[in-house]
């Protein structure tokens, strides 16, 4: 369910895009520093957006220049290390791990082989991240168990299944046991949107494979975009 939160480059001012790019590169460096060479493979726009949301207003910064491991000959603007980047890196690893485990469960044996291999390589990093963010890791586990139960019951309520996934993402708003109310609600609503859009995109594939899909469960096998409006 990753890949839906992307920057709209034409609508961004130059300084906004520079900040976004510096955050992306800073998060990549933070992932590599905390979790090794494999972790940056899971970096995406969703996690960059999460890092920006986790930043405290008083933590505004001036991007520094650093060398990218992908192109070490050229220096790029990067965010300096911060609590927001470290928290985003930890939560990114946890989400990536459970996404792989979910893929293994949903796909057939052979089709899930790449996810199995990646999960084995990511396991040490996941264990380290789970120690650093135990509450978030537990929230993700609990939400996925609840989602699995709803799927087995072929739950016809789109709201109920979307709410379960939204609470998973909402857990990322917690910082040292405290939860920012505004950020919490933003991530909750974002989680609902991601879940429903992903369900719509997966309709044909899930219908062909006979897998649970909340849109199909609600509107039947012939559900279409007209039903969703």
Residue ranges and their predicted role:
Residues 1-185, 192, 196-229:
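Acidic catalytic motifs of isoprenoid enzymes
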């Amino acid at each position: 369910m990753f890949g839906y939160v992307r920057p709209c480059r034409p609508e961004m001012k130059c300084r906004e895009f520079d900040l976004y790019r510096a955050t992306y590169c800073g998060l990549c460096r933070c992932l590599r520093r905390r979790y090794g060479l494999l972790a940056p493979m899971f970096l995406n726009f969703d996690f960059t957006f999460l890092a920006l949301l986790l930043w405290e207003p008083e933590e505004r910064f001036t991007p520094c220049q650093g060398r990218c491991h992908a192109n070490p000959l050229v220096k790029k603007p990067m965010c300096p290390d911060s609590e927001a980047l470290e928290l985003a890196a930890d939560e990114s690893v946890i989400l990536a791990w459970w996404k792989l485990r979910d893929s293994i469960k949903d796909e057939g044996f052979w089709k899930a082989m790449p996810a199995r291999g990646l999960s084995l390589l990511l396991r040490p990093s996941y264990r380290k991240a789970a120690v650093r963010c135990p509450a978030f890791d537990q929230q993700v586990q609990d939400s996925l168990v609840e989602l699995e139960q709803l799927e087995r019951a072929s739950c016809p309520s789109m709201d109920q299944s979307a709410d379960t996934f939204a609470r998973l993402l909402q857990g990322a708003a917690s910082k040292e046991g405290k939860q920012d109310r505004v950020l919490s609600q933003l991530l909750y609503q974002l989680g609902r949107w991601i879940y429903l859009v992903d369900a719509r995109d997966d309709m044909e594939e899930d219908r062909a494979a006979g897998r649970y899909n909340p849109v199909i469960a609600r509107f039947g096998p012939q559900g279409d975009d007209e039903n969703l409006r």
